[in-house]
Amino acid sequence: MKTYLVGGAVRDSLLEIPVVDRDWVVVGAAPSELTALGYQQVGKDFPVFLNPKTHEEYALARTERKSGQGYTGFTCYAAPDVTLEEDLQRRDLTINAIARSDDGELIDPFNGVADLQARVLRHVSDAFGEDPLRVLRVARFAARFAHLGFSIAPETAELMRQMARSGELAALTAERVWKETEKALQSQSPQVYFQVLRDCEALGVLFPEIDTLFGVPAPAKWHPEIDTGIHTLMTLAIAAQLSPEVDVRFSALCHDLGKGQTPKELWPHHHGHGPAGVLLVEALCRRLRVPNPVRDLAKLVAEYHDLIHTVNKLRPETLLKLFDAVDVWRKPQRLEQMILTSEADARGRTGFEDNPYPQGDYLRQAFQVANAVSVKEVVASGLQGLAVRDELKRRRQQALAEWKQTQDIPLDQA
C-alpha cells in the first residue's frame, strides 16, 4: 500500500500559493485495510476515507467509465490493481494530474508540470468530454489563475465548445452550476469565468440572461465600450476589486439584465431597464437556486443603481423612500453593498475605470444624517401608533433638507 498527495495541493505548492486542502490517493489497498487502521469511510459512490488523525481525505485509486448522461453518469472501479497513472488519467486537467510521493518525488505522466510552467489549462484525455461539469471547472480555474497568466489550450477550448453544443450541459443540476459559479465569483478575476463560458458557447445555455446582453448597445457618451455585455464584465471586474463578497459581485453581474429586454428600435437607450431587470434576476436566481440574501441584493441593485448615480439630485423624501426600500434601518450593510455595486457600474466603463465615485460618500452621509434622528425622542413626545412613524419621517426629511443645503458634488451618469 502506497499513498500519494494529489491534485490541487501538489499544483498549488508548485505555483507557490497557499495550499488549502490536501487530498491523497491510496494505491494497492482494499477498503478493509484502511478501516483496520482506523480510517472512516465517507464516500458513497467510491471509497473515500478520513484519516483518523488529520481528517484529510484518502481515496482508493480508481478508474471511471461513462455509463449514463451528465456528470453523475459514471461507473467507478476501485481495486488494489488500479495504478496511480490510471487514477491520474481520469482527472480533468494536466495541472491537476500530478502526484507527489512520501519522499517528495513528482509523478507526472501527463506533463502537468510543463503546463504549469507554461501557464496552460489542458485536458488530460478525451474522457474530459464525458463530464459536462468540467466545462464550468475549467472556466473557474481560468478565473482563479488569470492573474498568473494562465490560458486555455486551444484543443481544450474546442472540446469545451463541442460539449456545449452537444446538449450535455442541460444535465447539470442547478446546485452544481451555482456551486461552481459561487467559487468563480470568489476568485480574483470572476469576469474571466463568464468570458470563458461565452467563448465556448456555454453562457447562452447556462446564463441566457447574461449572454443576451452581448451586442446590445448603450449610448457611447456614457458607455464608450458601447456593448452592454462588455460593460457587465467590466463592472464585475471592478466589483471584485472593491469587495470580496459574492453578494456584491453577483449583483454587479446582474445589474443591467433589463437592458437585454429593450426593443431594438429603442436602442441605444434603455429607459426602465431597472424594474425590467428585477424580474430577470428573480427568474435567474430561482432557476439556479441562488441563496435568498444574494438574490435580494441583486434585485435591489437592478432596480435602484441608476437612482444612486443621481443621488445628489434626490429630494429628502426620495432618499427616505430609497432607505425604506433597501430596509437600511434594519440592514445597514445593504446600503454599503449597493454603493459598492453602483460604484463598480460607474467605473466599469472604458476610460472611467479610475474615476472617483462621490455619490458613495454622499449616500453614506445622508444615511448617517437620517439615522441620527432619535426614535426614542419621537416616542417620548407622547405620540402613538402611526403618528410616531409620520413624525419620525418628518424629522428625518427636515434633517436631510438642512444637510443637503451644505452639499455640492459633481454628477456623472452611468
UniProtKB/Swiss-Prot annotation:
- Tell me its EC number(s), please: 2.7.7.72, 3.1.3.-, 3.1.4.-
Positions of CTP binding:
8, 11, 91, 137, 140
Binding-site residues for ATP, renumbered to this chain: 8, 11, 91, 137, 140
Q: Where is the HD domain?
A: 228-329
Keyword Acetylation belongs to the record: no
Q: Which cofactor does it need?
A: Mg(2+); Ni(2+)
Q: Tell me which Gene Ontology terms the entry assigns under biological process.
A: RNA repair; tRNA 3'-terminal CCA addition
Q: Which HAMAP family match?
A: CCA_bact_type1, CCA_bact_type2
Q: Which family does it belong to?
A: Belongs to the tRNA nucleotidyltransferase/poly(A) polymerase family. Bacterial CCA-adding enzyme type 1 subfamily.
The free-text domain remark for this protein reads: Comprises two domains: an N-terminal domain containing the nucleotidyltransferase activity and a C-terminal HD domain associated with both phosphodiesterase and phosphatase activities.
| SUBUNIT field | Monomer. Can also form homodimers and oligomers.
Q: What is this protein called?
A: Multifunctional CCA protein
